[in-house]
């Protein structure tokens, strides 16, 4: 399935058939999250990237990636929350509105976006959550009203999945993917990935693959777990390529995604 999801574009493709992804990410405090995610998505091969955020961050995104389109618009997948703090009032309102209004888009919800997940969340069947352990524990405690400090690994991923109805990607040295079918343990990634911003890169890869393969997911030929697994594989391969040369920086990781795709396709 991963081979199918990572296929190269064909001569009949255009920028729209290659998928459109939207980002509501980054903030004045964490502007880099927007640059890392959009760069990773572009390097994954998505046809168009939209970005919604503060004016200062939007300017930084355009300076880094001039192909990005600013503002809301049609997209097959949305990345919500990476680098968005509680103080980002306008972005949080936009995230809440998009979650309420979206009917078919695939949602990848990360970091600050997880605050919008409640017991009444209704879009679990088309949503992937991407917490690290601390975020997963806080989310589970908020939803259950009980302490989850001692819940670990597969048990934690499964508990968050059951509480939300979403596909859950619990990030770590061995990333876990939880769905109604159970918990999948991904191959161990290089320890060098434990650095700021690499999760933003993973979200960008995952959203891009969701947009590129939207028709396969909508038609039942692929599941969100397949998208998540493929994204983790690309992320890990990019890290392996860089780790062979030394420490990893998140922007280098985002730019290495193209090379990782070539490696996996071969």
Q: What kind of region is each of these model predictions?
A:
Residues 1-106, 115-128, 133, 138-266:
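Small-residue (G/A/S/T)-rich helix-start motifs and N-terminal tracts that mark the onset
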